[in-house]
Structure formats: C-alpha cells, structure tokens
C-alpha cells in the first residue's frame, strides 16, 4: 500500500510541475517603445538567439526602420515587413550582435534588395524558445527555435 501511495504521489507531482511558469511568458513584452527586446527563440545561456528582422525597409508597413534616429533594434512589434531571421542577437541591448547575416526563405526570382525580397507576415506567435510567422508574399510558414549551441529553422513551403 505504501508503494502504491508513493507511486501515485510521484505521478501527481510530476504532472502538476510539467506545465511550468513558461506558459505565462509573453516574448512580445519590450518589443515596442524602445524596449530593445525581440520575441525570437532563445535558450538560456545559449550561443544562438534566432529572431525575426523587420526593420530593414521602411515603407507603409514599417513605420520605424533601422537607424531612424535612436533606433538600432532588429525587431519592432509595430512593423509588419520581414526581411529575414538573424541568428546572432542580444535581446535587451538594442542591436543584433556581430553584424546581421539574415536567413530569408523565398520562392521565385532572386531579388537582392530588402524592399523587394522581404514580405509582410501574419500569424505571428512566440513562446519561450520558439517563434513562428507566415510570410504572406511567398506563402511560407517560418518556424525557428534554438538549442544550447545552435539555432534551428524550419520553412514549410
């Protein structure tokens, strides 16, 4: 009887802890009003931090672009035009670290200018360690995550 009680108690404890506090985290907090954070995928103390980059082109969908006055961030919540995903970011400092080498899934003819190859996006979702968005122009679902030593991207065409 004691073993059964111990087994049931252990099972109850494991199931009650499994959800954790991460379900209450909103990665979009701090991505407006010069908060300088990004909603991208980060692993605690990891080497890679994969984040959307939506400040390269102003236009109508991006009211704020990179290097406008004080702005040096790689992501701004109010912007709606994505030009890729950066894998080297420090959230909270207001800049992509070590330069910006963007990974951008596209289809069709190769275009090199950000205002041409970029895309508006929808269905943006973020939770700790995961980010996704749907690239409207190319009809591509982009998902990114990170591990201790690398960032992983999955693009569904």
Where do the PLM segments sit?
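Accessory carbohydrate-recognition regions in carbohydrate-active enzymes
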Residues: 20-157
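Sec-dependent N-terminal signal peptides
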Residues: 4-15
């Amino acid at each position: 009887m004691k073993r059964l009680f111990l087994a049931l108690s252990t099972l109850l404890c494991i199931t009650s802890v499994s959800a954790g506090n991460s379900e209450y985290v909103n990665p979009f907090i701090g991505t407006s009003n010069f908060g300088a954070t990004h909603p991208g995928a980060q692993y605690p103390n990891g080497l890679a931090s994969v984040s959307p980059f939506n400040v390269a082109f102003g236009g109508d969908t991006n009211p704020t672009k990179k290097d406008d006055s004080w702005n040096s961030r790689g992501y701004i919540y109010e912007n709606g035009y994505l030009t890729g995903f950066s894998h080297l970011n420090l959230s909270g400092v207001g800049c992509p670290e070590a330069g910006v080498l963007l990974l951008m899934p596209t289809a069709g003819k190769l275009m090199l200018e950000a205002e041409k190859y970029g895309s508006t996006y929808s269905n943006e979702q973020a939770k700790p360690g995961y980010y996704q968005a749907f690239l409207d122009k190319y009809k591509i679902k982009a998902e990114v995550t990170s591990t201790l030593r690398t960032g992983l991207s999955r693009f569904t065409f």
